[in-house]
Amino acid sequence: MYDYIKGNLTKITAKYIVLETGGLGYVINVANPYSFSNQINQAIQIYIHHVVREDAHLLYGFHTEDEKAVFLNLISVSGIGPTSALAIIAADDNEGLVKAIDHSDVNYLMKFPKIGKKTAQQMVLDLAGKFVDINEVSTDKSKVSTINNNQELEEAVEALLALGYKTNELKKIEKFFEGTTDTAENYIKSALKMLMK
């Protein structure tokens, strides 16, 4: 079992980051890979959850222990797997999630990708009172310089597709941001706010 890994951040993709330590490159699935953009080629520490499956060993990474705790609570709910849990973390700053659980707001929970009514109701039942000791989770890191506007928007769309959002939803988002200049991380944050409305 791993608690965290320290290493050099060598790669960022739409679905995962690669952390090199001890001559090995670890593929780590994270909620918003582009939130690590300002740390590329730097030594970082990332909190880890290790999942062993028959066909694979998977690593899930988090900025903070609280973010990891939210993930572990989410995957304890029947119907929520690691990918859905990462999508929820990416789309929410924890405040909305906690309020929705506390107020049994099933409609809010159903806005997350791949969360239907039954799973949303299960979340309310299983997660009530579980977030009391967890601080606000935010993947908000310092801004990075823009490489290329189209490339940044393209990367953001790829990351949102990886989180389970549908292509037709994302076409509207792409059109909305057409002609703007921002980082992939900021595009993702803005798009997630729009998708959660």
Swiss-Prot record:
Residues 148-197 are annotated as: Domain III. Keywords: Cytoplasm, DNA damage, DNA recombination, DNA repair, DNA-binding. Residues 143-147 are annotated as: Flexible linker. Residues 1-63 are annotated as: Domain I. GO terms for cellular component: cytoplasm; Holliday junction helicase complex; Holliday junction resolvase complex. Gene3D superfamilies: 5' to 3' exonuclease, C-terminal subdomain, DNA helicase RuvA subunit, C-terminal domain, Nucleic acid-binding proteins. GO terms for molecular function: ATP binding; four-way junction DNA binding; four-way junction helicase activity. Residues 64-142 are annotated as: Domain II. GO terms for biological process: DNA recombination; DNA repair. It comes from the Bacteria. It is found in: Cytoplasm. Pfam families: HHH_5, RuvA_C, RuvA_N. HAMAP family: DNA_HJ_migration_RuvA. Belongs to the RuvA family. Homotetramer. Forms an RuvA(8)-RuvB(12)-Holliday junction (HJ) complex. HJ DNA is sandwiched between 2 RuvA tetramers; dsDNA enters through RuvA and exits via RuvB. An RuvB hexamer assembles on each DNA strand where it exits the tetramer. Each RuvB hexamer is contacted by two RuvA subunits (via domain III) on 2 adjacent RuvB subunits; this complex drives branch migration. In the full resolvosome a probable DNA-RuvA(4)-RuvB(12)-RuvC(2) complex forms which resolves the HJ. Has three domains with a flexible linker between the domains II and III and assumes an 'L' shape. Domain III is highly mobile and contacts RuvB. The RuvA-RuvB-RuvC complex processes Holliday junction (HJ) DNA during genetic recombination and DNA repair, while the RuvA-RuvB complex plays an important role in the rescue of blocked DNA replication forks via replication fork reversal (RFR). RuvA specifically binds to HJ cruciform DNA, conferring on it an open structure. The RuvB hexamer acts as an ATP-dependent pump, pulling dsDNA into and through the RuvAB complex. HJ branch migration allows RuvC to scan DNA until it finds its consensus sequence, where it cleaves and resolves the cruciform DNA. This is Holliday junction branch migration complex subunit RuvA. It comes from Streptococcus mutans serotype c (strain ATCC 700610 / UA159).
